[in-house]
Amino acid sequence: MFEKGLLYDEPSDTLYVNFERCNCATYLGLNDHILLGVDAERSRVVRLMLQDFSILAQRSEFGPRSFPMDGLEEMSPALRKLAMQLAHSPPVNEYLSISMYSPGGIEQVPIITLHTDKLVARAA
């Protein structure tokens, strides 16, 4: 049964953010824990899957945690472009932000930060 909104699976510690019904989702892994469920025919995100959510939601003493988007390295250039476009667009960008970390000022590492306050508020 489809349920729009948030669905938390406690045994797997996975939070599903369902945007619309679609049985044809292809998953694009932004990293090992954050995946976009995409309707490939329409190039549209239908689900955001957050695995090990309790780890992703932990705050540090400095604020929310950010995670490298190392899943992009495994994608073709076309899929990488699509993943970045979708991640920057509604409804996905309501739940996460993408920025760039530049260690040493030369290397560019895309990172992702979840809006955990918004996720927790909507789950309550």
PLM regions: where:
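Intrinsically disordered terminal and processing segments
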Residues: 1-33, 40, 55-62, 66-124
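Short, well-structured hydrophobic secondary-structure segments
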Residues: 35-50
